[in-house]
From Swiss-Prot:
It comes from Legionella pneumophila (strain Lens). Keywords: Metal-binding, Zinc. Inhibits all the catalytic activities of DNA gyrase by preventing its interaction with DNA. Acts by binding directly to the C-terminal domain of GyrB, which probably disrupts DNA binding by the gyrase. It holds the Pfam family YacG. Interacts with GyrB. Belongs to the DNA gyrase inhibitor YacG family. Residues 43-70 are annotated as: Disordered. Binds 1 zinc ion. This is DNA gyrase inhibitor YacG. GO terms for molecular function: DNA topoisomerase type II (double strand cut, ATP-hydrolyzing) inhibitor activity; zinc ion binding. Its cofactor is Zn(2+).
């Protein structure tokens, strides 16, 4: 009996098998894996949510540093 799960590559849609020895899973190839990475890096892929003001992060970190020093 074959228990290996068939999946589609998220980039090209090619059918492949989910196997522990596939170093590119869930992608079918290194090419598709790198395309996906590039899409995240260029922000053409994003996780939906509200934008965060970078200044508020700095302010929050500074407040935490002051608490840690006390």
């Amino acid at each position: 009996m074959n228990n290996q799960q068939k999946i589609k590559c998220p980039i090209c849609g090619k059918q492949n098998t989910w196997r522990p020895d596939n170093q590119f899973r869930p992608f079918c190839s290194e090419r598709c894996k790198l395309i996906d990475l590039g899409e995240w890096a260029s922000e053409s892929r994003k996780i939906p949510g509200s934008s965060i003001d970078p200044e508020s992060i700095v302010t929050s970190n500074n407040k935490q540093d002051n608490v840690d020093e006390q």
